[in-house]
Design a protein with these regions (language model features):
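Electrostatic, structured charged patches in enzyme active sites and in nucleic-acid/phosphate-binding
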Residues: 1-149
């Protein structure tokens, strides 16, 4: 079990880290309480937990293999969320990645190597997730603070 102090800053970032306690635990499919690593992840957990159209959800349940063009390596990444949503008379599975909007667009400053690398790695991950989700008949969405706040 990971020892996490809610509201504390993450080891590798300035993000708040904490344990999310679902209000509707029957909807959460994890074996342990989910640990959010950012405010956006916490907001997404709250949205999935409280939305009546969401039947079930899980946090970081699926490893996806992708080719990291920035570092020329095959890597794995865990999709942030998988949700099953009611859509009329049927259900659909949605893979969700949560990112700050600034990381979903090419950097404005072409000389910002860190931002350019982050964007390139993210697009590699998202292309792999999109392809795999589509092959399984699922949807893939990237949510930012604009959709979650």
């Amino acid at each position: 079990m990971i020892n996490v102090n809610p509201g504390k800053r993450g080891k590798y970032s300035n993000a708040k880290v904490g344990v999310y306690r679902p209000l509707n635990p029957q909807k959460y499919l994890g074996s342990q309480l989910p640990i959010y690593k950012s405010e956006l992840e916490r907001l997404c957990m709250r949205y999935l937990d409280s939305n009546d159209l969401i039947v079930s959800w899980s946090y970081e349940p699926q490893a996806i293999k992708y080719f990291d063009k920035a570092h020329n390596k095959v890597r794995h990444y865990y999709i942030d969320f998988i949700a099953v949503a009611k859509c009329g008379n049927f259900k659909k599975t949605i893979w969700i990645e949560v990112k700050p909007e600034s990381e979903t667009k090419p950097p404005r400053n072409k000389k910002d190597f860190k931002a350019a690398t982050t964007y390139l790695v993210n697009t590699c991950k998202w292309e792999a997730a999109q392809q795999l989700a589509k092959s399984k008949g699922y949807e893939f969405h990237i949510l930012t603070e604009a959709q979650l706040k």
